[in-house]
Amino acid sequence: MGGEVSNKTWVFKKSPSSLPEPGVHTAFEDRPLSLVAPPGGLVIKLLTAGLDPHQRDRMRGAGNVDYVPGYEVNEPITNFSIAKVIRSDNDVFEEGSLIAGSLPIAEYGIIPRELIDARAMASPLVWKVSNDYNLDVKHYVGTLGLAGMTAWNSFYGLVKAVKGETIWVNAASSSVGEVVVQLAKIEGMKVIASVSSDDKLDYVVNELGADVGFNYRKEPVGKALKPAIENMKWFGRIISCGTASQYNKPVEEQYGVTNLSEIFRRRIKIQGFIFWDDNIYTDNIENFKATMPKWVSEGKIKSRYTQFEGIEQADKAFLSMFTGGSHGKTVLKISDP
């Protein structure tokens, strides 16, 4: 069964030097799509797209060599999303099943066999979602998707929590931070949480259970990394999953750390990571899949979403992450399941 459908698509047009401008750096285009699955591949209908600050980093363009490829001019903007399979020529993904992973942000998409088979280090780029607990699908781009896997794999793979230790979670109300706060409390840690507003402070302390928190826009602590280094105990660990506050700044204006000598004095370890790294993904992902959906269904793990509806809201949703207009995970609902 074939046919062709109109297909509104969010397209990358030009690399920005600061905040992206809708209509200049991104655009919406109708890219009609044939409803015929390619050999071994799929046709999908997008349900909910996740939006993340790291997409701004990818807007440096295809020539940018980084942990994920830069976006190509005049190609769809992709990110971690969930979709429904509407045509299939693949034994694993039957029609009607749910698929999550790195997908084009459009009303419909073609998933070739090559993408189904591809991997980014230890992780596949797309995978089947069972949704055994009948959860809202937005969780699979948030707490049960990229944000949750980032939090889980780094917490259990790198933090290596010890009961009674203290952890400072910066951007604690973010989609990753909120999960880390709750995992730390489950493992018996004392949690200090820093956020950018009083509303977020109330959330992380009174709903997520952080022991103490502060609004860094009101407290004279400076940039988080410098005071963290200055106050860290010997053999402390700093885990970095991104630098969202710096993505819209040219290199010469980005934040510099002036107390690096404290790293050797205090024997501090600083570790960057991506959730799919072999050293943390393989040993932790199965526990994540077995545990987190149940915890979310039981309310043991809470999460907050800022949801925008309609693909036409993609620019507004994306920019909200850099202007303080989103809480928790930013998602774009494109269609119903």
Swiss-Prot record:
Cross-referenced Pfam families: ADH_N_2
EC number(s) given by UniProt: 1.-.-.-
Family stated for the protein in its record: Belongs to the zinc-containing alcohol dehydrogenase family. Quinone oxidoreductase subfamily.
Keyword field: Oxidoreductase
Enzyme kind, highest EC tier: oxidoreductase
GO molecular function list: oxidoreductase activity, acting on the CH-CH group of donors, NAD or NADP as acceptor
Listed SUPFAM superfamilies: GroES-like, NAD(P)-binding Rossmann-fold domains
Top-rank lineage group of the source organism: Eukaryota
Phenotype of null mutants: Impairs the production of fusaric acid, but leads to the accumulation of trans-2-hexenal.
Protein function: Dehydrogenase; part of the gene cluster that mediates the biosynthesis of fusaric acid, a mycotoxin with low to moderate toxicity to animals and humans, but with high phytotoxic properties. L-aspartate is suggested as fusaric acid amino acid precursor that is activated and further processed to O-acetyl-L-homoserine by cluster enzymes aspartate kinase FUB3 and homoserine O-acetyltransferase FUB5, as well as enzymes of the primary metabolism.
UniProt biotechnology annotation: Fusaric acid is phytotoxic to plants such as cotton and banana. It has been shown to induce programmed cell death in plants. In addition to a mild toxicity to animals, fusaric acid exhibits acanthamoebicidal, antioomycete, and antimycobacterial activities.
Cited InterPro entries: ADH_N_2 (IPR041694), GroES-like_sf (IPR011032), MDR_fam (IPR045010), NAD(P)-bd_dom_sf (IPR036291), PKS_ER (IPR020843)
Gene, per the UniProt record: FUB6
Zinc as UniProt keyword: no
CDD domains per record: PGDH (cd05288)
Name listed for the protein in its UniProt record: Dehydrogenase FUB6
Pathway assigned to this chain's UniProt record: Mycotoxin biosynthesis
